UniProtKB/Swiss-Prot annotation:
Biased composition (Pro residues): 1371-1380
Organism taxonomic ancestry: Eukaryota, Metazoa, Chordata, Craniata, Vertebrata
GO cellular component, one term: postsynaptic density membrane
UniProt signal peptide: none
Subunit structure: Homodimer. Interacts with F-actin, nectin and NECTIN3. Essential for the association of nectin and E-cadherin. Isoform 2/s-afadin does not interact with F-actin. Interacts with ZO-1 and occludin, but probably in an indirect manner. Interacts with RIT1, RIT2, NRXN1 and BCR. Interacts with ADAM10; the interaction locks ADAM10 at adherens junctions following ADAM10 recruitment to adherens junctions by TSPAN33.
Annotated tissue distribution: Isoform 1 is widely expressed, including in heart, brain, spleen, lung, liver, skeletal muscle, kidney and testis. Isoform 2 is mainly expressed in the brain.
Organism in which the protein naturally occurs: Rattus norvegicus
UniProt modified residues of type Phosphothreonine: 1218, 1239, 1337
Residue list for modification N6-acetyllysine: 1812
UniProt biased composition (Low complexity): 1316-1325, 1401-1412
Other comment: Isoform 1 increases the viscosity of F-actin in a dose-dependent manner. Isoform 1 causes F-actin to associate into bundles and meshworks.
Gene of this entry: Afdn
Entry protein name: Afadin
Length: 1829
């Protein structure tokens, strides 16, 4: 609270206290409030002693902060009531007034309760009561209070009463009987409750006296109060209109409530309604505690001359709440009789009805009503009920299906006729009987067809004969039927009318939330014409559809209808304009708190009180969460039960106070049961699979029930404790559920660290993590958990993933995880999580809570080798603090060909982080620590909105089934209310029913529909549709639907205005969107022309149970590089943003690609599909109209390599193989690839084929182009970089600009080879690294070298379940595909794609020097590359010529494009040519490469070679001689492999103590050796038989697999050797540390020995010191009688004492002694400073010999026997100050009761001992005496 607010609060409180003190006795004066608003006062308490039969009283002073519990404990001590008790009684404190009492809650403040009496100057008492006491039988009749017999003491003694006592006893019995009869007539007092007797007993036994009251002068106070109230009311009368007669007095009788009080007079205005008069009357009669809603005022008409008490001939009518009694009384004609008003309890079965007033049980006749029923409450003619024609001029009652209402009340058809029904009988037929009658003509209409009777507010229709066809709501009737507003009447076969009762609808407009919006109406009854059909277009009644009802009883009325004027009554006018009547209704409507019968829930529940516990237990304790269809059924049932307890249907005999207590008890019982269930769920075996389901189920129900109770205007005020407990339960269930899901996630977390090289079926995969998350999300949605809770829960799960991975990175340096390789793997796996979060609308939570691990992996994979990288690192990894950055960089494991990270770079990065991230953390109050906190430091927040009650209408599906078993067993009964508005928020606080009804009057029927309304919308696109869509499957739906997530401001949809969030898009331009995926739907929507026709199901999301989808946050975030040509940022949402921007995609009218070009891809394997969905979900090119590629194919054409879908996720495969399109001449590489590390061992041709390793050539191999015969051509398109990329490296801008400008000049598709920045390490929080593999053929790959360019090879997985993953750093690339054949078709095509815009968030601009260095390196590389390209040109030309000739011959040759001979020059993936070579489409080279040592067998499954590839694979050596030489080498290599296997097997077999790993390896080697032997035999046979090429291919594949496995094993050995070296180094470090520890330990031992020696010397010194002390003492005692002696001898000083230097201040305290050398000399004190130390009195005289004078240093350095002399006495104050200055801080806390030995032992152990001296009392007195001299 602000200071100003607190001051204002204090001032108000002070005024209240001042008023209290002015009226109360001085004893009970209350103090003024403190700054904390606390005050004190004296209170009187009474104690009812049941055993003694009397009351005791005590006054105690109480604070405003003292609770009831505190006061009870104090009073229990004061009254001592439990002296005789054997058990501990339970006490309660009651606030007692004359009118009743109530028990105080435990946490109420009694003094505050007493101060509240100030409001009405009430008097009261506080009574302490033992709840365990039984009521003594007939205690009231036993003895009088003045002569109480102690029944608790003497129970069997019965003495004879005297005459006087007998008389008094009889008198008391008579009084008791009278009181009992009073209580029977006043059920409000709750005569069945013991508490109701307490007030009577207190005031009977302790009558009002000056002793028992608090008010000082009650008569004066009450008189003053009445005077003030009267003056205030009179002022109101005068100020209303100035007339003196606008108010007056009215007598209110209460014969049934207070028969002994004739009447009370109240002051009323003529405009005060009856409900106000009720409240005033109750206060007058002393019943102010009662609920006014339970009482009413009835006007009783007595015959003229009759007395009030004479009830014969009296006619009683209960006034409605808004009628004005005084106005009625003044307008009452005196000749009609006497009018009196009675206050009475509202009958439990009474239902207020409009104009249904009973006079002796008979309805009034029309004439009586016209003459005498108005009483000043005349209504305008517009208030009369009427019939409105539905089908004028059509003779078809379905004609209203398509009309709509205009503002003036007319409609689009012929003008409908409207007939007012006067207060009499209206005849209907072909004949005109009088002005009242309605004349109709047509088939089936009889001359006197039927009668419409309007009496007592009830309108009935009665057919006149069996032939008169009369239908009510489609059902033919033959007898009198009562009409309800909204019903349809049909006369004959063609006349259809709607019956409307404005009075009844006026009540509905006041008391319903949504009016007709939710009314079920008669739509459930077969054969009835659906009212909702009519209301499609809006009601003729000023566009407001009105509810219908099938009930046979009128449910509500508002006030007595007045008789119209005589002229009005006799006429039936067809009226067209109805807006005046609507305005009148709006003016007259008046909000009421009382919920009338029509203002009820869609259903209610009834249960017997005897089975209450069983009923609640069945709902809560025995509900199986997995079998409940509507998961929130318990909540809705419990809420209905609460409302039932609060209603008069539940025990109508009890008082409102008791009803409130009952409701509180029921709610508390519910909450307690729910608490037990949630705790029990958590305590059961955690292995049960349904524990998460049960927790989510009860978390959802607890939160929904809490919302119901909080919002309910009646329950919210009385269930505060239950609300607190429920809120705690929601949080508890949330915590348990988070723990449960985190435990499950923890089992699969190793999937993030799954090495793609080690394929193990047992280990968890990332699919398991995604499955866990998906299961959690579907569980929460199934349980209808609030969206805000869902987001909080997944924030916890994302944080757990972040924490687990990050802590593994930074705390396990030996694991090798801090490497480029693992950084890429973890980042790739995190991409799956982010893609999943994006699909679920949780991308913000994922971005936030995965940020640290994402930035850590980005750090591992980005450039960090030169000082220029420092700004990039710090700006990218801004969330990592200095400790975390230091750990990641220092523990970084470099790849074999990767440069080391400079130490100064690490220091600079850490220094920057200390000034930024560390300071930011400290300013937020967080510690800078290495590890991530396991707990997410965010508070749990209960959602304010988004609950089901806002969207659930009527009885939810599944609720009836949930209750059926309970209903069948008789526990309860479900009562649907068809007349209800259908909303569950009917009793909520602040629900504005009328305005809601008025606002919704054009959409009233929608929630009644089983299916949403379908409309057709035509949009004219400007720069896009302006829609954000999302795909989802609703409840009961088999197929996905496309829903509008949001409408972009300013877009075409926004301008049109008909589309809104929650609408379902059914089709676009006639093509259905139902069942399509989100990306597919986006494709269809982007391929539309400038005019789009959409078929829309309005608010389909709500109808299909997807309302929470609209509640999920979709903030507008500017995406960094996701800009269109216009440069405008695009809003970000869960769905697509559908844009069609001409800057990128051509004009909107650009020719559309044919439908056949957009073949839909097949289902992708799990991860690929998920990644593809994510890719399409994030922003990308396939949401825009792409111009046809130069090859004439759409970029969406399916194919192995041509299916490019996404933002920087790269290209994902489809499983289908389609004929290839023509290759694009201008492929644009995807901007982000995974990093790959390649090992380039030295080979014979390395100096010719590859740069030396120190040169770090800055190039990148582009994805390989395939021949026409390959699976598919690559069509790589430029994509805008993903919106999540935060920045691009500095090289990117210059490189891209240079390369793209080169593309404008050249048609060389290889020019991308030097655009290193196109594969920069984009540092994004959501960047995907798992891509690229699906965009190329299975044999293709990407290579890159140079600093920061170590790409982890993306393994190409042809298998359906394969996931694109990085390959090991030191494995060779798979064999390259053959060079593509390119014809001249593509030559000369210029670059026509626009350049991508510069990124929005760039790093610092590159300096000119860096740019120049980059250019120089590039030019050197290009020069080197020119020579290589020239050689390639020649090779290629020769190859092409030979291929045509020798194609068949080459098929029979077993060629291996990437054979693994360590001796031969091997083919390497080709490198594209430089930019300087025009007129080339693709130029690549094959670079020989010496093979690394090992390769995994699994890696070879990616090396699939087709016949065409084999035929063109050996392009550089097509002649047979080279081929023969190579085949010989292969044979030698195979033999060499077998020999190596044999050797290794022999070594392992000879090894005696093999480890488990070695045994496993031996087994694998044996299998491999056998396989190799069989392979050699098979190959020999193959060569002999000269088999077909296919067998050769198989043999080569087998050889490749064998060689790969062999090399993988060798690599494993190398890795193990590396690990052994690491372990050796670790051991050396540990040995060194151990040696240092030993040295330190020896040093400490030496110091200890020295200290021991010192201690022995000290003991000798202290013994001498003690002897000297005794001598001084004796001498001092001797000199006591000689005060003129100049001084006292000092204790001996150490031998090495030196006087302090003159320069040092005499009072300066010496330095404290060293902890580990207490006996080392530090500083020797002067005699003064030694002797003036503080002394501490010690009471034991026997301890004198232990006295040790201790100075500040406790003589830590003293040793010796030199004695000093006392020069002169000093002033006591000077000594004291010096001794205090010399005292060490903290020394006062040491123990002073130690013996000398103990102090010596502490010294020897190096511990500090107190500086205070332990002195005897005598010595202390002596010293004080000496000091005063």
């Amino acid at each position: 609270m602000s200071a100003g607010g607190r001051d204002e609060e204090r001032r108000k409180l002070a005024d209240i206290i001042h008023h209290w003190n002015a009226n109360r006795l001085d004893l009970f004066e209350i103090s003024q409030p403190t700054e904390d608003l606390e005050f004190h006062g004296v209170m009187r308490f009474y104690f009812q002693d049941k055993a003694a039969g009397n009351f005791a009283t005590k006054c105690i002073r109480v604070s405003s902060t003292a609770t009831t519990q505190d006061v009870i404990e104090t009073l229990a001590e004061k009254f001592r009531p439990d002296m005789r008790m054997l058990s501990s009684p339970k006490y309660s404190l009651y606030e007692v007034h004359v009118s009743g009492e109530r028990r105080l809650d435990i946490d109420e403040k009694p003094l505050v309760v007493q101060l509240n009496w100030n409001k009405d100057d009430r008097e009261g008492r506080f009574v302490l009561k033992n709840e365990n006491d039984a009521i003594p039988a007939k205690k009231a009749q036993s003895n009088g209070p003045e002569k109480q017999e102690k029944e608790g003491v003497i129970q069997n003694f019965k003495r004879t009463l005297s005459k006087k006592e007998k008389k008094e006893k009889k008198k008391r019995e008579k009084e008791a009987l009278r009181q009992a009869s009073d209580k029977e007539e006043r059920p409000s007092q709750g005569d069945d409750s013991e508490n109701s007797r307490l007030a009577a007993e207190v005031y009977k036994d302790m009558p009002e006296t000056s002793f028992t009251r608090t008010i000082s002068n009650p008569e004066v106070v009450m008189k003053r109060r009445r005077q003030q109230k009267l003056e205030k009311r009179m002022q109101e009368f005068r100020s209303s209109d100035g007339r003196p007669d606008s108010g007056g007095t009215l007598r209110i009788y209460a014969d049934s409530l207070k028969p002994n009080i004739p009447y009370k007079t109240i002051l009323l205005s003529t405009t005060d309604p009856a409900d106000f008069a009720v409240a005033e009357s109750l206060e007058k009669y002393g019943l102010e505690k009662e609920n006014p809603k339970d009482y009413c005022i009835a006007r009783v008409m007595l015959p003229p001359g009759a007395q009030h008490s004479d009830e014969r001939g009296a006619k009683e009518i209960i006034l409605d709440d808004d009628e004005c009694p005084l106005q009625i009384f003044r307008e009452w004609p005196s000749d009609k009789g006497i009018l009196v008003f009675q206050l009475k309890r509202r009958p439990p079965d009474y239902i207020p009805k409009k104009m249904k007033k009973h006079v002796e049980g008979k309805p009034l006749k029309g004439k009586d009503r016209a003459d005498g029923s108005g009483y000043g409450s005349a209504l305008p003619p517009e208030k009369l009920p009427y019939l409105v024609e539905l089908s004028p001029g059509r003779r078809n009652h379905f004609a209203y299906y398509s009309y709509h209402t205009y503002e003036d009340g007319s409609d689009s058809r012929d003008k409908p006729k409207l007939y007012r029904l006067q207060l009499s009988v209206t005849e209907v037929g072909t004949e005109k009987f009088d002005d009242n009658s309605i004349q109709l003509f047509g088939p089936g209409i009889q001359p006197h067809h039927c009668d419409l009777t309007n009496m007592d507010g009830v309108v009935t229709v009665t057919p006149r004969s069996m032939d008169a066809e009369t239908y009510v709501d489609g059902q033919r009737i033959s007898e009198t039927t009562m009409l309800q507003s909204g019903m349809r009447l049909q006369f004959g076969t063609s006349h259809v009318f709607k019956f409307v009762d404005p009075i009844q609808d006026h009540v509905l407009s006041k008391r319903s939330v949504d009016g007709g919006l939710m009314v079920k109406g008669p739509r459930h009854k077969p054969g009835a014409v659906q009212e909702t059909t009519f209301e499609l277009g809006g009601d003729i009644h000023s566009g407001t559809a009105l509810p219908a009802s099938r009930s046979t009883t009128r449910l509500d009325s508002d006030r007595v209808s007045s008789a119209s004027s005589t002229a009005e009554r006799g006429m039936v006018k067809p009226m067209i304009r109805l807006d005046q009547e609507q305005d009148y209704r709006r003016r007259e409507s008046r909000t009421q708190d009382a919920a009338g019968p029509e203002l009820m829930l869609p259903a209610s529940i009834e249960f017997r009180e005897s089975s209450e516990d069983s009923f609640l237990s069945a709902i809560i304790n025995y509900t199986n969460s997995s079998t409940v269809h509507f998961k929130l059924s318990p909540t809705y049932v419990l809420y209905m039960a609460c409302r039932y307890v609060l209603s008069s249907q539940h025990r109508p005999d009890i008082s409102p106070t008791e009803r409130t207590h009952k409701a509180i008890a029921v709610v508390n019982k519910m909450v307690s049961m729910m608490e037990g269930v949630i705790q029990e769920v958590d305590q059961v075996d955690q292995k049960q699979k349904n524990i998460a389901g049960a927790l989510a189920f009860w978390m959802a129900n607890a939160s929904e029930l809490l919302n119901f109770i909080k919002q309910d205007r009646d329950l919210s005020r009385i269930t505060l404790d239950a609300q607190d407990v429920l809120a705690h339960l929601v949080q508890m269930a949330f915590k348990y559920l988070v723990h449960c899901l985190q435990s499950e996630l923890n089992n699969y977390m190793p999937a993030f660290l799954d090495d793609p090289e080690e394929n193990s079926l047992q280990r968890p995969k990332i699919d398991d993590v995604l499955h866990t998350l998906t299961g959690a999300m579907s569980l929460l949605r199934r349980c209808r958990v609030n969206a805000a809770l869902t987001i909080q829960l997944f924030s916890q799960l994302f944080h757990f993933i972040n924490m687990w991975l990050f802590n593994r990175l930074v705390t396990d340096p030996d694991s090798g995880l801090c490497s480029h390789y693992w950084g890429a793997i973890i980042r790739q796996q995190l991409g799956h999580i982010e893609a999943w979060a994006e699909k679920q609308g949780l991308e913000l939570a994922a971005d936030c809570h995965l940020s640290r691990i994402v930035q850590a992996t980005t750090l591992l994979t980005m450039d960090k080798y030169v000082p220029d990288d420092i700004p990039n690192i710090n700006s990218t990894c801004f969330k990592l603090n200095s400790l975390q950055l230091q750990a990641l960089l220092q523990n970084y494991h470099c790849a074999p060909d990767e440069p080391f990270i400079p130490t100064d770079l690490i220091e600079n990065v850490v220094a920057v982080a200390e000034n930024t991230a560390d300071e930011l953390a400290r300013s937020d109050g967080r510690d800078v620590q290495l590890e991530e906190d396991p707990d997410l430091q965010l508070p749990f927040l209960l959602p304010e909105d988004g609950y089901s009650c806002d969207v659930v209408r009527n009885i939810p599906n599944g609720l009836q089934e949930f209750l059926d078993p309970l209903c069948q067993r008789g526990f309860c009964r479900l009562v649907p209310h068809t007349r209800s508005p259908g909303t569950w928020t009917i009793y909520f606080e602040g629900a504005d029913y009328e305005s809601h009804l008025m606002r919704e009057n054009t959409e009233l029927t929608q929630p009644l529909r089983k299916e949403p309304e379908v409309i057709t919308v035509t949009l004219k696109k400007q720069n896009g549709m302006g829609l954000s869509i999302v795909a989802a499957k609703g409840a009961g739906q088999d197929k996905l639907g496309i829903y509008v997530k949001s409408v972009v401001k300013g877009g075409a949809a926004d301008v049109d205005g008909r589309l809104a969030a929650g609408d379902q898009l059914l089709s676009v331009d006639g093509r259905s969107l139902v069942g399509l995926s989100q990306e597919r739907a986006a494709e269809l929507m982007t391929r539309t022309s400038s005019v789009v026709t959409l078929e829309v199901a309005k608010q389909g999301a709500i109808y299909h149970g997807l309302a929470t989808l609209l509640n999920q946050p979709s903030p507008m975030m500017q995406r960094i590089s996701d800009r269109r040509g216009s440069g405008k940022p695009r809003p970000k949402s869960e769905g697509f943003e559908l844009y069609n921007n001409s800057a990128q995609n051509g004009s909107p009218e650009s020719p559309q690609m044919p439908w056949t070009e957009y073949s839909e891809p097949k289902k992708l394997p799990g991860d690929d599909r998920l990644m593809k969905n994510r890719a399409d979900h994030r922003s990308s090119p396939n949401v825009a109209n792409q111009p046809p590629s130069p090859g004439g194919k759409s970029p969406y054409t399916s194919g192995t390599a041509a299916k490019i879908t996404s933002v920087s996720t790269g290209n994902l495969c489809t499983e289908e193989q389609t004929p290839p399109p023509r290759p694009e001449a201008y492929p644009i590489p995807t901007q982000t690839y995974t990093r790959e590390y390649f090992t380039f061992p030295a080979s014979k041709s390395q100096d010719r084929m590859a740069p030396v390793q120190n040169q770090w050539p800055n190039y990148e191999e582009k994805p390989h182009m395939h021949t026409e015969s390959d699976h598919a051509s690559i069509a790589i398109q430029r994509v805008t970089r993903s919106q999540e990329e935060l920045r691009e490296e500095k090289v990117y801008q210059l490189e891209r600009h240079r390369v793209e400008s080169g593309m404008d000049r050249k048609c060389d598709s290889d020019m991308w080879i030097n655009q290193s920045s196109s594969v920069e390490s984009s540092t994004s929080s959501q960047e995907h690294l798992n891509h690229s593999s699906k965009s190329v053929t299975p044999a293709s790959t990407l290579t890159k070298s140079g600093p920061g360019r170590w790409k982890t090879p993306a393994a190409v997985l042809p298998t359906p379940v394969a996931v694109s993953q990085p390959i090991r750093t030191d494995l060779p690339p798979p064999p390259p595909p053959p060079p593509a054949h390119y014809t001249s078709d593509f030559d000369g095509i210029s670059m026509d794609l626009p350049l991508p815009p510069p990124p929005a968030n760039q790093a610092a601009p590159q300096s000119a020097q860096v740019a120049a260095a980059e250019r120089k390196k590039r030019e050197e590389h290009q020069r080197w590359y020119e020579k290589e390209k020239a050689r390639l040109e020649e090779e290629r030309e020769r190859k092409r010529r030979e291929q045509e000739r020798k194609l068949g011959q080459m098929r029979t040759q077993s060629l291996n494009p990437a054979s693994f001979s360590p001796l031969a020059t091997q083919a390497k993936p080709e490198k594209p040519s430089t930019l300087q070579r025009p007129q080339e489409t693709v130029i690549r080279e094959l670079q020989p490469q010496q093979q690394p040592r090992t390769i995994e067998r699994r890696d070879l499954q990616y090396i699939t070679i087709s016949k065409e590839e084999l035929s063109s694979g050996d392009s550089l050596s097509p002649d047979p001689w080279k081929r023969d030489a190579r085949e010989k080498l292969e044979k030698q290599q195979q033999m060499h492999i077998v020999d190596m296997l044999s050797k290794e097997i022999h070594e392992l077999q000879n090894k005696g103590d093999r480890t488990a790993e070695e045994s496993d390896r031996l087994r694998k080697l044996m299998l491999e050796w056998q396989f190799q032997k069989r392979l050699q035999e098979s190959k020999q046979k193959d060569e002999d038989d000269d088999e077909e090429e296919d067998d050769d291919v198989d043999t080569m594949l087998i050889m490749q697999r064998l060689e790969a496995e062999r090399r993988a094993r060798l690599q494993d050995e190398e890795r193990r050797r590396q690990q052994q070296l690491e372990e050796m180094r670790k051991r050396e470090v540990e040995d060194r540390v151990r040696q240092e520890e030993d040295g330190r330990h020896q040093e400490e031992e030496r110091v200890k020995r020295d200290a021991e020696e010192k201690r022995r010397q000290e003991e000798g010194y202290y013994s001498r010191l003690e002897a000297e002390r005794r001598r001084q003492h004796e001498e001092a005692a001797r000199r006591l009688l000689e005060p003129e002696e100049p001084g006292l001898s000092r204790p001996p000083l150490p031998q090495d004492y030196e006087p302090p230097s003159q320069s040092s201040a005499p009072s300066a305290p010496p330095p404290p002694p060293q902890r580990n050398a207490s006996y080392l000399k530090t500083q020797v004190l002067s005699p003064d400073s030694l002797f003036t130390a503080k002394f501490v009195a010690y009471d034991d005289d026997d301890e004198e010999e232990n006295y040790v004078p201790a100075g500040p240093n406790s003589y830590s350095g003293s040793a010796g026997t030199t004695a000093g002399t006392y020069d002169a006495p000093r002033d006591t104050r000077e000594k004291l100050s010096r001794s205090q200055d010399a005292d060490l801080p903290g020394s006062s806390g040491a123990p002073e009761n130690l013996t000398f030995r103990e102090r010596q032992r502490l010294f020897s152990q190096g511990q500090d001992v107190s500086d205070k001296v332990k002195a005897s009392r005598k010595l202390t007195e002596l010293e004080n005496e000496l000091n005063t001299k």
